[in-house]
Amino acid sequence: MTKRYWNINLEEMMGAGVHFGHGTRKWNPQIAPFISAKRKGIHITNLTRTARFLSEACDLVFDAARRGKKFLIVGTNNKAAYSVARASRKARCHYVNKKWLAGMLTNWSTTETRLNKFRDLRMEQKKGGLNHLPKRDATMFKRQLARLQTYLGGIQYMTGLPDIVIIVDQHKEYTALRECITLGIPTICLIDTNCDPNLSDISIPANDDAISSIRFILNKLVFAICEGRFSYLRSP
């Protein structure tokens, strides 16, 4: 894996609040090597370690994007949802930002069936087919379409399992992480001080509660993905 320079600035990370962890009572002892201090009852993340692992993650996604690999970004907590959708659209990645449906990856055949249903309903709606149904049936299908859009809208163009999954909140997205581990899909996780760094292929110690922190990390990863995709398109 080629090492590159990603302009990861410690002052910018501090400005984004990347270094703020959880309260000292809510921590995972496995995270100890990533903690530099305690301040006013909270743990402070070692930003030098954050920069190192974020740089490694950027190298990984750059190389993967350069080889045409597919990415899935997962972050369903309220503070992450908008940033996840925005970053994913910019980098043309699949994403889940509302709710992780159990078995979304491990039971891919069921997910594929739901996606096909979603596409069929969208096509019918575009053609105006739903307008010709009895009012009760049309209302039922529109509700079903709205629900599918909410939960599957970010993966509507996904035709198979992703090559790499980026998880914004390891603690909240534990089910998604376990599915990736079961399937052997490489993961990159933002880990706060209540997380286990040993569960992911690359763990980036960072504040997963602040929008500014989440956005900082995602922006770096998205930039690396976009650079990799550009390199892929230029290759003969």
Curated annotation (Swiss-Prot):
The keyword Plastid applies. It comes from the Eukaryota. It is found in: Plastid. One of its GO terms (biological process) is translation. GO terms for molecular function: structural constituent of ribosome. It comes from Cuscuta exaltata (Tall dodder). One of its GO terms (cellular component) is mitochondrial small ribosomal subunit. Keywords: Plastid, Ribonucleoprotein, Ribosomal protein. SUPFAM superfamilies: Ribosomal protein S2. PROSITE patterns: RIBOSOMAL_S2_1, RIBOSOMAL_S2_2. HAMAP family: Ribosomal_uS2_B. Belongs to the universal ribosomal protein uS2 family. InterPro entries: Ribosomal_uS2, Ribosomal_uS2_bac/mit/plastid, Ribosomal_uS2_CS, Ribosomal_uS2_flav_dom_sf. It holds the Pfam family Ribosomal_S2. This is Small ribosomal subunit protein uS2c.
